[in-house]
Amino acid sequence: MIKYTDFFELIDNGGNLPIAALFMTYGFDAELFEHHILPSFIGILDDPRENELRFRNQIALKLKEIPIGVISDSKQFNGGRTFLYDHITVQNETFHPKCYMLLFKEYLRVIISSGNITKSGLCYNAELVWYEDIYLDKSNSISNELQFILSFIEERYSLDNMPALKMIRKYLNKCEFNEAYPKIISTCSNKNVFNKVISELKNCRGNCKTITIISPFFENDREKEIESTLLMSFLNEVKNIYPKAKINICFPANKQGDKYIVNAPFGIFNEVTKKYKDISLFVVPREWEREDDDPISRTLHAKLIYAQFDNGYNLYLSGSINFTNNAMTSSISNLRNIEIGVLNYTKQKLILPNFIKVSLSNLEFVEKEETIKQLTCFINKAEYNGKDLKILFNSNKMVVPCKIYYNENLLLSIDNQIEEKIIKNFILKKPQDLKVECNDFIFYVPILIPNKEDIITDDLKLNFELDMKDIIDYLSGKYKSISELERMKRIVSNEKQDRNNEMLIFFRQNLQRFYKALLAL
């Protein structure tokens, strides 16, 4: 079984001074990020449900000091951003890593996971999480590859104006690198993950007894350059190195009657079990255990290749990499997915989930129906300079007619293909994204703000200094909560009402509230 780990404990600054953070994720839930991850990292203790205005004011002030960057896949973004932090969405390839880098004053925390920044990834799925803290006065084995990945991403996606990325790269430049395990591997290199894993298996000491492959997704597409499925190709390589190694293939399933319903392609398993008799199939049910041993239903989303050797060592690969062609065979020359994983060779054993051994006759393959049409994100950039909003379109991909909304209001209605549109005197409100509606699909585009330090949002205009009148009003029951009081103060401030005139107008009412408040004390 995989023990339950609270991801949010790794994000919490624990009293350490936060400097910058970069979050690279496939799916991105802005509400989850802004209400839980962001405040945990920058050190905001207020609950937005109890005091939303103060919560937003504190985060807005912190973001003036601490640069935050998010990179996610464009097709998986559903809008919802409300704070000034950098967010870039990737369109050219599938951006699939789950790598989170948190820079504190004393160290850099690197988290490599199978879980996205979504409610499913951080709260409900069964995921694997690996992390390491890098200190400047200690050598490490991962800083060089991380530096290479960030350099590649910065150049490929033109991230020259992302301060969080630059600050983390600057820190990595100071680190002392040592060639050892664990190693970071990615698809941002000339050698793909498939070949890297095979090379590592060849170079390990001892004989491999067992290899366990856990993946929520498998592919059975036969590409022209591959004579068999990816899984068969991998097993052929493994058996060539370690002929006696046993292979365990594990995948999620739901039990219905005497059958296990799976979405892993049936043909793959039929092919490999016919050729190799020492291959075992296992299903991972949706029943997991937490540390308190209370059963909890979780969907398997972890990815793992786990090789056990007769010398007591174990080689494992975890991270974002599914056992699919797009993930395992991508490289710079054939880049379909951006993936990041960690490869470790250690005597430490992993605690695996409860497996149920099955035969092919126990399985029933159900292919998921694609009900949603493929998105085409045709806006390259939406950039706000403090006065105007410039929208750049990819005319080759553009779908018309389309409508662009901001803050639930129609901003543009476009009937013909264009390359650029400038919205003069654009007023930035609370939402930080554009919503694009076409006939068949909807997508969201984050608004980029290069000069964030010059932008004063409503969250920064709030003043929470309460005077005697405010206290009297609150105690007398004029306001249901402190949040309502602060909201009214903001309205008064925005309307620039004169304080002296206001006190004259409401003198009698305030006097009545004063006596009422005395009775309440």
Language model regions located:
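Terminal interaction modules at protein C-ends
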Residues: M1-L317, T324-L521
